[in-house]
Amino acid sequence: MSLGRLRKVELRDIWATEAQDFTPWLAEEDNLNLLGETLGIELELKGQEVSVGPFRADILCMTLADDTNVLIENQLERTDHTHLGQLMAYAAGLHSATIVWVAAKFQEDHRAALDWLNEITQDEFQFFGLEVELWKIGDSPAAPKFNVVSKPNDWLSLIHI
């Protein structure tokens, strides 16, 4: 029996830029559905590059369950303090209850910061950290995979209700 081999694909080989390639791709309905499946949340797009004062948040969605705002901030690199600050400012400016940080790789201190935020905030706020990967088998198209690295403490029990 012959089986294919998984081969990891560099994110920048598919998405050269975050703003012009990755964000529009993620905002497409099928791709938001894939992200939503990973989170256990049904998402509906409200906008891309949404103004927050003089700045722009990557993606704003709402949950279909309760119409609350979901902020999605993307980073096609290793997480950094700048994006952590942007996440907080955009979440406050857009009154987001669910905050999703998608990155190529999470530094441990940034994962710990999201875990801490999940511990200290009220139950209506949820912080997620996801690493995005791309994989191929042979000459197949690249396939995305979202890996949850940080989630609310009660997240698993909430999505099974």
Labelled PLM ranges:
Residues 1-159:
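Charged, terminal alpha-helix-loop-beta segments
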